[in-house]
């Protein structure tokens, strides 16, 4: 099993798809990494040679991925909260940040509905 950036890449997948298991690498970046490392996109991860894996590791190392990227995102959110910006307050309250409506919908961000006390006579 290939290990790149601290992540076990699934051996049955093609190299391009397998690289997307790494946080911070999507399809486009995975394709560019494979092309730069001279690895065929359709080659399965289990069939990659040690030299090819090493070339892929070198190219992945150029990007901010996994733990470093997660930390960077968290620090950016924390900075917004500390500055007291509108976006920071929305993050803090667990509401949508990018201007979406909240009167209806937004259930993913707000969580499950809370039971309201009924005011029946």
Swiss-Prot record:
InterPro entries the record matches: Rbsml_uS13_C, Ribosomal_uS13, Ribosomal_uS13-like_H2TH, Ribosomal_uS13_bac-type, Ribosomal_uS13_CS
Annotated spans, Disordered: 91-121
A GO-annotated cellular component: small ribosomal subunit
Ribosomal protein is among the record's keywords: yes
GO MF, any single term: rRNA binding
GO biological process, one term: translation
Coiled-coil regions listed in the entry: none
Function: Located at the top of the head of the 30S subunit, it contacts several helices of the 16S rRNA. In the 70S ribosome it contacts the 23S rRNA (bridge B1a) and protein L5 of the 50S subunit (bridge B1b), connecting the 2 subunits; these bridges are implicated in subunit movement. Contacts the tRNAs in the A and P-sites.
Record-linked PANTHER family: 30S RIBOSOMAL PROTEIN S13/40S RIBOSOMAL PROTEIN S18, SMALL RIBOSOMAL SUBUNIT PROTEIN US13M
Quaternary organization: Part of the 30S ribosomal subunit. Forms a loose heterodimer with protein S19. Forms two bridges to the 50S subunit in the 70S ribosome.
Protein name, UniProt field: Small ribosomal subunit protein uS13
Lineage: Bacteria, Pseudomonadati, Pseudomonadota, Betaproteobacteria, Burkholderiales
